Amino acid sequence: MSRRRRVVRRAVATEGCSGNVLLARFVNVVMHQGKKALAEKIVFGALKMAESRLQGESGIAIFNTAVANVMPKMEVRSRRVGGVTYQIPVEVREDRSTSLALRWIVKAARASRKRTNKTYMSCLCHELMEAYNKRGGACKIKEEKYRMAEANKAFSHFRF
């Protein structure tokens, strides 16, 4: 039996995000060195750019679809059995799946920022558009996780 206490989840403040908790979490993931106002400016600017590229779709709808397309359902976890470490495929909880999707989108946008000579806002917009269309760096990370889970399906009987 674990002696640790149950973790109490804090509610995310959604002041500037019009009550959208997912968008507030995304702003927090984009935020660097505590500069939340700058992170909000980047995120909302990227959503506005995406909205102008896709006529008829709101920026929030594009964002929600992009995150839903990147959210993983399976991942692998390491488990040591008899001196051998196995990669065991397990299902991902909803909150972890959302967190991973947000992190992967930001990671892909930062990687493309280093490769290209564009602003971070335009790179984030491009990555959101790619995720909306089920392409891009974040979707590649998701597919890679799925391939690992599929390759190690034989070890799924070693459940946690």
Swiss-Prot record:
Q: Which GO terms describe its molecular function?
A: rRNA binding; structural constituent of ribosome; tRNA binding
What GO cellular-component annotations does this UniProt entry give? small ribosomal subunit
Note the InterPro entries from the entry: Ribosomal_uS7, Ribosomal_uS7_bac/org-type, Ribosomal_uS7_CS, Ribosomal_uS7_dom, Ribosomal_uS7_dom_sf
Q: Does the keyword Amino-acid biosynthesis apply?
A: no
Alphabetical UniProt keywords: Ribonucleoprotein, Ribosomal protein, RNA-binding, rRNA-binding, tRNA-binding
Q: Known SUPFAM superfamilies for this protein?
A: Ribosomal protein S7
From the UniProt record, give one GO term of the biological process aspect: translation
Q: Does the keyword tRNA-binding apply?
A: yes
Purpose:
One of the primary rRNA binding proteins, it binds directly to 16S rRNA where it nucleates assembly of the head domain of the 30S subunit. Is located at the subunit interface close to the decoding center, probably blocks exit of the E-site tRNA.
Q: Which family does it belong to?
A: Belongs to the universal ribosomal protein uS7 family.
Its subunit composition reads: Part of the 30S ribosomal subunit. Contacts proteins S9 and S11.
Q: What name does this protein carry? A: Small ribosomal subunit protein uS7
